[in-house]
Amino acid sequence: MNPPPERPRGMSYPYEFKCLISQLKSTKTQEFINEYTKDSAKLPSENVTEYKYTDAEDMLTELCELYSYGEESTYKSNSEAFEAVIKKLGLPRSWKLLSDAEKMSILMSLANDLDHRNVRVRMRASEGILYIAQGCWADLVDTEEHAESIGFNGILLYHFGIFTSFVDLLKIEVANFHNKKELSENNSRNLRIILNVLYTITEVIRKEKNNICSEYTHHVESFCTEMLFNDESLITILFDMLVRFCDCHTYSYHFPLKKVLLLLWKLLLIALGGLSELEETKKEIRMDNGLPPEHDSSEEQQPDPNRFLDVINLIDLIGESSQRGRVKKRPKVRQEEHNKFLRNARLRFEDSNVKDDDTDVVGLPAPICSSIEIIKKHLYTPLGQRHVEREKLVRSHPDTHPDEIELTPAELIYEMLFPNFNEYMVSLLKVVLWCGKFRTERLFSGRPPISGLAPEADPNSRILYSVVLYIDLFRHNEIILKAVSAILLLLLKHLKLNNVYQFEYMSQCLVTNNVLTILMAFFKQNIAGFVTTLNEIPALNFTECVTGTSEIKADCLNQVCTSTVSSRNMFFCINFLRVLNKLVKWKPARIEHLESFRNSKAILNRLVEIKHDTIKLYALKLLKMQMKYTRKNWRKRHVHLINEIYNRVRLHMNDSFLTYVPPKMTRDKLEDHKDENLLRKDIAEFNERRYGDLEKQQHIDIDFCTRKVVETQWLLPYCLNRAHHELLTQEFLC
């Protein structure tokens, strides 16, 4: 038997995990896997277009992704913990048959056990609460009934204060988790139970927030308030857990990373809002700043026989005939492009230029004046420009223009994350590096082991369990990438809407840590076959295990390839493309860095071949930015790409993306990064002026003088002074 794959120094895999990993490399297992995946590399292009990009999947699908296939044995343990409480109180076993008073008595008993000193008692009560959060599935057989039960129980648990209690439990377990030098699977099991309860309640709140006719709107508002206005928010706790895991993974390899990232993503999604809420908020903010709403959509272009009289319109019509029903976006013109056009026209026809005058057209020919009118008609002022203008006024005239900070959700989250923002971004990029490898020989290289993944293997069916592990490993990576991509995109979009300097600071943190290279290396893989490979075993999903049979048989693998496209993989591929577009848009230095990546245009060309409109759109946008650095021969060979760019990507009125810029005419290195350096300086001044106090709190000098510490008068709360002797007796003298 082959030795286990290479691992980071200082790590040790569990024995069962070693055996299954070694079994993965055996000849019989590889033949089984190759037969299982032989049809996965085919690209059914007509079915890829069926995927609809949304903020997240439905509640049950998201809950299924929370659990690994190796956690199926814990479902029964949760049910037994609940039955023990029922037996203790002398109540009927069925949750549906209990009255409201009896349900409250059960929750009261479990909540009391959560405060017990014994860890085993606390965790046993947590298992019982997790069974309730899972919908009390023992009496259910229907999926719809199961979803309703999860929704009702989740709201009931939040109303009873279980969510806050589990946040406190999480703090205790995290503190104990990192104080121990030797960890085992049991230490991670406690964290997994707590995170499962928190995530299930969060997912129920997300479902109620998306439901316009929900009866629990006040619970959603209370949840958002608790996330944003708490002194120690759960969002910050989860980010700190992520940083500790990435920095000290040699000691905490049992850390449930997937559950942490999934919970963090859903908390940000609830607090900040999804894409539809973002567009509505953007329209309101633009109107408050005196700007018209963004004209992204227009009427669908339909063929018109009268347009054959115009040759240019005829060319457009031919392009539309092959892409019927596509929404055409109006072109935009920036203010600096308008000023540049007017300045060049004056220098050409009047041999003069007037500074700070962008309206005078006296002396210019009539065609130029008509062109300027058309440009003004399509003039678009981005919201970030207003942010920059307001920041300049605050800096130059602080007395007459005070900085009025609106406490929006994005502002509050930025204040939470600012002291350690760079560490958080580095940790997310490390996770992308670990999980962005989709070859079997690279699956374990340079990354910590995964806890709660290996099922209990039967020696008689070792190959079958190895195949399940193989599928679950890739599934685990895909879910982690899905969460990380959504977190990055959510933060980028909402911070850009709140204040452009916050967005630029996050972009700077990511670009400085080589996010462009990391994402391009990720897309260098076979993405076309990857988005159609479904690493899923429906028979082992959470909903199927609790309502049916969870026994692993060879027949259950036949259900894997029923779907032809992986919505999970499509989701984070689109997200990563959108993140790349956000980071390099209107940044020449970053575009050149992206273009300098080996075979970057070939990588994007392969993405364009995927027949999905959203992936194709963002890949074409990246190609359009790099087009001015491509030579004539490349453009001749890829005329179809230029045609696709004209048909799909929004163009500017005086767009010159086809103008070739030879290397000898490019700016030197200092001039090329001049804008980046100025932007970095503005960001530093913005953060120092607004959040300087938050950063200073992280660098307070500590006085280690014992005498001064003893002489210091500490003011204790009244309740602590009153119960001081009782506390000493219970905690220290017993």
Give residue spans per PLM region:
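Extended alpha-helical scaffold domains
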Residues: N2-C734
